[in-house]
């Protein structure tokens, strides 16, 4: 902020021709907001130029001052876009302005909407910059919804798919529990025009996911991702030996949580998997003498014990099991 911006607008020669427009709260406001004087005056001058539709360099500067006081004001962002277009302003400078605002308030829908508008105007040449911008934001908050949404929009609208799978791997190497990174990985393999789609990527992704599962069987995200790799292909889901094998591998271990392996096996059984003796033996080894002859019922009973938070859910699943799911 330069020196002139610390001087009240009413004392600046540049604004001497403008009559500020006060906020109309009606004749008898019940609880008028006690705005700070700087904010009140800035908004009064903004209203004046907004209603006169002044699209000038000083109007652009005023929107900046106003947004620095309240970056969530949608009307100010909207008017700023009108002024930017009227002045044919350098939009690369605008990206820098947005980044300054984001340093203090990145969880601001209006800011991201404006960022998308600017990036769309600039086109594919800024794809790399947008991906780097979201990378910086996500390094501070790995689950930042707006950053992920903007990143997916950037890939879809501007490009930059080439290194995205590697970026997802980088995030998962740092934190395999990062469900946002798993979600992004699925977005990439299903949407990237460079990879051939889900079916083409399935074999390598199943291998990748099983490795992650065996490293940490208590990570629900990787189990969910594994099932998603067979979306709309139940036959492959129940017939691929890799899936039931990873369940058996985890169930045979004594050093980990078995809940997600059991729930995956339950899904397989309910979808039509015919259990082998190995499946039956692995499940019965975890039973506490529960008197169940139906394997799927037994899995639900064990899940109610090892996953008590969702005990009611597993009881409901048990009630829906058909005789075929043995």
From Swiss-Prot:
One of its GO terms (biological process) is regulation of cell shape. Optimum pH is 7.9-8.5 for CTIL substrate and geranylgeranyl transferase activity. Optimum temperature is 30-37 degrees Celsius for CTIL substrate and geranylgeranyl transferase activity. It is an enzyme of class 2 (transferase). Pfam families: PPTA (PF01239). Its EC number is 2.5.1.58, 2.5.1.59. PFTA repeats lie at residues 55-89, 90-124, 126-160, 161-194, 201-235. InterPro entries: Prenyl_trans_a. It catalyses: L-cysteinyl-[protein] + (2E,6E)-farnesyl diphosphate = S-(2E,6E)-farnesyl-L-cysteinyl-[protein] + diphosphate; geranylgeranyl diphosphate + L-cysteinyl-[protein] = S-geranylgeranyl-L-cysteinyl-[protein] + diphosphate. GO terms for cellular component: CAAX-protein geranylgeranyltransferase complex. One of its GO terms (molecular function) is CAAX-protein geranylgeranyltransferase activity. Transmembrane segments: none annotated. Keywords: Magnesium, Prenyltransferase, Repeat, Transferase. Its cofactor is Mg(2+). PANTHER family: PROTEIN FARNESYLTRANSFERASE ALPHA SUBUNIT/RAB GERANYLGERANYL TRANSFERASE ALPHA SUBUNIT, PROTEIN FARNESYLTRANSFERASE_GERANYLGERANYLTRANSFERASE TYPE-1 SUBUNIT ALPHA. Belongs to the protein prenyltransferase subunit alpha family. Essential subunit of both the farnesyltransferase and the geranylgeranyltransferase complex. Contributes to the transfer of a farnesyl or geranylgeranyl moiety from farnesyl or geranylgeranyl diphosphate to a cysteine at the fourth position from the C-terminus of several proteins having the C-terminal sequence Cys-aliphatic-aliphatic-X. Heterodimer of an alpha and a beta subunit. This is Protein farnesyltransferase/geranylgeranyltransferase type-1 subunit alpha. It comes from Arabidopsis thaliana.
């Amino acid at each position: 902020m330069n020196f002139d911006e610390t001087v009240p607008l009413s004392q600046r020669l540049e604004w001497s021709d403008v009559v500020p427009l006060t906020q109309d709260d009606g004749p008898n406001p019940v609880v008028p907001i006690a705005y700070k004087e700087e904010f009140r005056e800035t908004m009064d001058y903004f209203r004046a130029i907004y209603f006169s539709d002044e699209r000038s360099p000083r109007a652009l500067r005023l929107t900046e001052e106003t947004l620095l006081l309240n970056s969530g004001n949608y009307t100010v962002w909207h008017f700023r876009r009108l002024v930017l277009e009227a002045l044919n302003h350098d939009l690369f400078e605008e990206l820098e302005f947005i980044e300054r605002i984001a340093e203090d308030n990145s969880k601001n829908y209006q800011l991201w909407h404006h960022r998308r508008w600017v990036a769309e105007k600039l086109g594919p040449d800024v794809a790399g910059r947008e991906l780097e911008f979201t990378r910086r934001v996500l390094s501070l908050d790995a689950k930042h919804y707006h950053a992920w949404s903007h990143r997916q929009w950037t890939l879809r609208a501007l490009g930059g798919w080439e290194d995205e799978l590697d970026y997802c791997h980088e995030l998962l190497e740092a934190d395999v529990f990062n469900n946002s990174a798993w979600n992004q990985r699925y977005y990439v393999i299903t949407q990237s025009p460079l990879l051939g789609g889900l079916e083409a990527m399935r074999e390598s992704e199943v291998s990748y996911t099983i490795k992650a599962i065996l490293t940490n069987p208590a990570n629900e995200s990787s189990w969910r991702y594994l099932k998603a790799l067979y979306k709309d292909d139940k036959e492959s889901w129940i017939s691929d030996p890799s899936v039931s094998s990873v369940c058996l591998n985890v169930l045979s271990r004594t050093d980990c949580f078995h809940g997600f392996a059991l729930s995956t096996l339950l899904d397989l059984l309910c979808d039509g998997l015919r259990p082998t003796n190995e499946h039956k033996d692995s499940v019965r080894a975890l039973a506490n003498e529960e008197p169940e002859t139906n394997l799927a019922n037994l899995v639900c009973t064990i899940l109610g014990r090892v996953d008590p938070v969702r005990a009611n859910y597993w009881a409901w699943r048990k009630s829906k099991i058909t005789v075929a799911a043995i």
